Amino acid sequence: MSQTPFWQQKTLAEMSEQEWESLCDGCGQCCLNKLIDEDTDEIYFTNVACDQLNIKSCQCRNYERRFELEEDCIKLTRENLTTFDWLPPTCAYRLIGEGKPLFSWHPLVSGSKAAMHGERITVRHIAVRESEVVDWQDHIMNKPSWAR
């Protein structure tokens, strides 16, 4: 049996569903709401987290039912991955798709999310709950430098 991790052996298309799911580092970026300018299609990043996101752990409170509970919940698939060009350069799906290695803090490499939180990769230090926000425009952040 090979000691080489699956993400170094397989393309995204070759991964099982379990392998695909395990690539997600749980940073929470997908769970922050984005606003889209209707005239220009420009994406505005906010720090407003979906109410299903547990901000402290950066995990979905209702992962199995997320699409029922949140109609705008994002589902990354092999087929639509390239349409999410706002994903951060740290995103494992993006990294593997570009033939790059995972970072040392990624839970598959480090064994836990502690290193991610320590490096401030997760959104827990910036996120606010959607249900607590009155005016989303007050929560627009500058477009991250990594956004294409």
Curated annotation (Swiss-Prot):
Pfam families, A to Z: CxxCxxCC
NCBIfam families, alphabetized: PRK05170.1-1 (NF003498), PRK05170.1-5 (NF003501), PRK05170.2-5 (NF003507)
Annotated HAMAP family: UPF0260
Family of this protein: Belongs to the UPF0260 family.
Name the record gives this protein: UPF0260 protein Spro_2751
